[in-house]
Amino acid sequence: MKITYYIAYALWYLLSLLPLWLLYFVSDLLFFPTYYLARYRRKIVRRNLTGSFPEKDLKEIVRIEKRFYHFFCDYIVETIKLFSMSEEQMKRRMVFKGVDHIVSAMEKEDKNFCFVYLGHYCNWEWIASLPYWCPDDVKCGQIYHPLYNKAFDRLFLRLRNQFGGECIAMKETLRRIIEMKRAKQKCIIGFISDQAPKWNSIHHWCDFLHRETPVFIGTERIGKQVDALIYYADVKRTRRGYYRCEFKPLTHRPKEVPDYELTDRFTHLLEEMIKERPDFWLWSHKRWKRTKEEWIRRQQEEEKK
């Protein structure tokens, strides 16, 4: 594992030293073998797109599909570039709006936490540069799911932690947040909440892109426990290699919001963002691999035991 990690790190770091314009040229070259030869998850992407946009004909679906793969190749080289990107360049290319409003709201409301809903939209890896925009007394964190490949898990942890934030493993989320609460540490924590939960973690379903979809509820559940500010990250790609993330408030008093309403609002906002530019969402993820019918069947079997 260590050898694999050091080899991968050395290769990625050397590639990151190339100027971004040259890396985008590499991205353009990557598109053909990724889409036409390797056909990386083509069936999954096509199935996800056709189910999400039943009103679009095949020609339009294929157009979105190809634009997604072009962006996916950009995402790869942009992520590699993070290994050597300077703070100045990072702040020029990944701009955050609304951080000052979050910080002032934390002071005004006497809150230690702000939880931010995120999706796999645009380059979510660049969101890890948020600490560059925060005052020293406000810590940043992100909840992540460890990768099965230990070498690449270590590689991505190094990549995400280099900006001064903290990666919190999903299973350690509540414990770590309680530790920070006891220490009275102010913290902005990002929750990527558009993945498919495991069967035993499904508690709520949303209407998302024309399908009943199981969703994570941890953001609002833990947010209510620690009385966090709840925000949503509205991310846009302004042009190639440039992004803007605007933090928009959902509530400053989560305990007063009915259960699942915050999750539903996030899901709706994410859907609207995807509809505006569908090529920037991660369509290669098996988002709808768990159906409500199968979930109900499993629930009924559990009740019989």
Q: What role is predicted for each listed range?
A:
Residues 18, 37, 52-54, 135, ...:
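A broad structural signal for alpha-helix termini and local helix breaks/kinks
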Residues 59, 66, 108-109, 133, ...:
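Non-catalytic C-terminal accessory region of glycerolipid acyltransferases
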Residues 110-171, 198-207:
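Catalytic core of membrane glycerolipid acyltransferases/transacylases, capturing the structured
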Residues 1, 35, 117, 145-146, ...:
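A generic secondary-structure micro-motif detector
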Residues 92-99, 149, 170-171, 212-213, ...:
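A conditional alpha-helix N-cap/helix-loop micro-motif detector
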Residues 97, 166-168, 248:
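General small-molecule cofactor/ligand-binding pocket signal
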Residues 1-118, 123-124, 153-159, 164:
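Membrane-anchoring hydrophobic helices of lipid-metabolizing enzymes
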